[in-house]
C-alpha cells in the first residue's frame, strides 16, 4: 500500500512568468497561392526545453475563425486550442494552410495573420504571410481553335 501512495504524484507545471517555449520559426511564408486553390502545409514546432511540464493557455490564430489560415495542431484542425500540456523536454507539431478568397486585384497581394502561443500570462507569435494571386482557372476546358487570352492575370490550366 505504501508503494502505491509514493508512486502517485501530482502533475506540476512550470508557472514562472519568465518561461518561454522554443518555436522552430518566427515567420511562415507562402509564395504565390492562387485564390480558392489552397496551399500546401507549412510545419512548425513548439518545444519545451524545461525539466518541468508546461501548460499552454492557448495556441490560436490571431484572426480567429475569420482567418484565411487554418491551424492543425497534433492532428486536430481548428482556429484555437486551449489548455495544452507540453511534457518536459517534449514538443508538439503544428501545420498551417492558407486558402485565399478572390478579390478584384490583378496584381499579387498579401494576407497576414499570426499563431499566438500563450503561456503563464505571456504571448509569443509566429507570423504568417501568404502572397495571393487571382487567376483564370481553366478546368476541363477544351481549346479547339486559336484564342487570344488577356494578360491581366495568370491562367491555371
How should each PLM-predicted stretch be described?
Residues 9-12, 101-134:
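Terminal connector regions
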Residues 41-49, 96, 111-118:
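Buried hydrophobic-core signal for structured, non-transmembrane domains
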Residues 9-32, 38-40, 49-97, 102:
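Surface-exposed binding patches on compact interaction domains or structured appendages
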Residues 58-60, 98, 121, 132, ...:
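A mature extracytoplasmic/lumenal domain signature
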Residues 155-157:
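Beta-strand-rich extracellular passenger or scaffold domains
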Residues 4-7:
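C-terminal motif of bacterial Sec signal peptides marking the signal peptidase cleavage site
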Amino acid at each position: 500500500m505504501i508503494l502505491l501512495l509514493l508512486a502517485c504524484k501530482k502533475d506540476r507545471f512550470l508557472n514562472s512568468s519568465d518561461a518561454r517555449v522554443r518555436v522552430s520559426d518566427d515567420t511562415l511564408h507562402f509564395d504565390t497561392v492562387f485564390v480558392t486553390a489552397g496551399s500546401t502545409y507549412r510545419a512548425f514546432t513548439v518545444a519545451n526545453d524545461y525539466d518541468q511540464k508546461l501548460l499552454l493557455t492557448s495556441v490560436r490564430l490571431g484572426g480567429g475563425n475569420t482567418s484565411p489560415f487554418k491551424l492543425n495542431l497534433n492532428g486536430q484542425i481548428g482556429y484555437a486550442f486551449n489548455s495544452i500540456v507540453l511534457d518536459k523536454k517534449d514538443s508538439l507539431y503544428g501545420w498551417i494552410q492558407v486558402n485565399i478568397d478572390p478579390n478584384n486585384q490583378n496584381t499579387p497581394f498579401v494576407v497576414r495573420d499570426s499563431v499566438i502561443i500563450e503561456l503563464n500570462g505571456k504571448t509569443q507569435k509566429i507570423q504568417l504571410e501568404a502572397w495571393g494571386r487571382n487567376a483564370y482557372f481553366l478546368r476541363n476546358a477544351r481549346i479547339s481553335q486559336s484564342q487570344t487570352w488577356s494578360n491581366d492575370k495568370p491562367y491555371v490550366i
